[in-house]
Amino acid sequence: MEDIAKDMHIAKKTIYKFFPSKEALLQGIVEYGFSHIQENKKNILQQDIPYLEKLKKLLIAMPADLESIDFKQLEPLQSQYPAVFHQISTHLSSDWKPVLDFIQKGIDEKIIRDIPLYMIEVIVTSSMNSLLSSSCSPASYQQSINDLADILMKGILIWNNVS
């Protein structure tokens, strides 16, 4: 809290007026971040870009102001602030309806193979959670998510549509 107050040039008391604890502050940051991710997804869906480009953007949907965060550094939250870590995991496992609806559109238009949507959701969410809980990848979280999107998309494309 001291570091945050110092960086913001305010007193710790001011922070504690809005957030009664470090955990409450972290929960607020998580909510802020994920609300921006959802807003970013809405903006992507409104863009006039090719289907596959839009799909990849949706899968990685990280707003520019959060791209520099290496989410793998959040692993200590699991032991220090389990409620915050659970909140992150819950967000990663939910909020997929717009993406799944968009994938269904691709299935309907024969751009994507007819595969169960729940399986895509399981693969993506479990991979994201695994990347958060693991330091096995030498790449940043954002790069790992980009890699995941590439692997997923190349596995779901109908090959005669690949350019």
Predicted features along the sequence, with ranges:
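Helix-turn-helix
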Residues: 1-24, 28
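Generic hydrophobic, amphipathic alpha-helix propensity
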Residues: 4, 29-33, 37, 99
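Short alpha-helical transmembrane interface motifs in multi-pass membrane proteins
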Residues: 23, 55-56, 84-89
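Hydrophobic alpha-helical connector segments
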Residues: 28, 39-68, 120-124
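Phosphate/oxyanion-binding loops and surfaces in catalytic or ligand/nucleic-acid-binding neighborhoods
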Residues: 36, 58-69, 109, 127-134, ...
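Short amphipathic alpha-helical interaction patches enriched in hydrophobic/aromatic residues
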Residues: 41, 45, 131-136
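Short secondary-structure transition hinges
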Residues: 63-101, 107, 133
